[in-house]
């Protein structure tokens, strides 16, 4: 399955909502930016709030009990958003956000160091995006990231193609080797088991149970209610 970042991304949002509810906080600030992250082909990732998918996969293959681990699903999101009225706010969408300008500011003010790629501050995500996605799924997420910079006029198409054609997704071969060893060790795999995983056929998230099954079933009804009665549950 392509989106092995789901458990981490889901947990971040779930516990943001839990703490917001506990302390009666009505707004959660999110660092998402439409101008740099607004485009993502559907086959590059999977629905992040797919609680049913996570639970089904864990029930089949999980070896560590989830215990009190909370997972955010579609219904949970609606409850937090509509009933508790806890809103996600995206401050960067209210600004003339220019990625290179923002990087220059945090370098100067906070001595920030460029990690060499989007989300590459995380070893797991760096290895996932820089190695697993290109080698197992033939997906280069830089295409999506660079496309948004082109759309927001922060980068030319020619410059983007130059990056894609001449720069490796990994900052260096040495770092790639270190991250690979780290990942294999943390996952409790042998190198042979890892290579077998990379070479095995990709399986869709939809092979397992999914919240999207409910969407598929209810979407015709929702479109009718929205058109005839102007009922907007998801807006």
Kindly give the residue locations of the regions a language model identified.
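Nucleotide-activated chemistry modules centered on ATP-dependent adenylation/adenylyltransferase
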Residues: 1-235
């Amino acid at each position: 399955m392509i989106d092995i970042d789901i458990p981490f991304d889901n947990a971040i949002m779930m516990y943001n909502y839990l703490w917001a509810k506990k302390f009666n906080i009505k707004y959660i600030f999110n660092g998402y930016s439409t101008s740099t992250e607004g485009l993502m082909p559907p086959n590059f990732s999977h629905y992040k709030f797919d609680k049913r998918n996570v639970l089904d996969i864990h029930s089949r293959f999980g070896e560590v009990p989830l215990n009190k681990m909370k997972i955010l699903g579609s219904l949970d999101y609606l409850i937090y958003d509509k009933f508790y009225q806890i809103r996600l706010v995206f401050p960067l969408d209210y600004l003339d956000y220019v990625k290179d300008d923002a990087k220059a500011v945090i370098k100067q003010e906070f001595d920030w160091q460029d990690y060499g790629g989007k989300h590459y501050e995380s070893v797991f995500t760096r290895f996932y995006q820089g190695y697993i996605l290109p080698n197992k799924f033939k997906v280069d997420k830089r295409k999506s990231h660079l496309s948004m910079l082109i759309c927001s006029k922060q980068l030319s198409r020619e410059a983007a193609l130059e990056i894609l054609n001449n720069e490796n997704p990994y900052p260096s071969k040495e770092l790639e080797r270190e991250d690979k060893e780290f990942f294999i060790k943390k996952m409790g795999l042998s190198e042979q088991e890892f290579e077998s995983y990379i070479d095995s056929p990709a399986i869709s998230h939809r092979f397992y149970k999914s919240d999207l099954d409910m969407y598929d079933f209810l979407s015709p009804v929702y479109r009718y209610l929205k058109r005839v009665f102007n009922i907007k549950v998801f807006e």
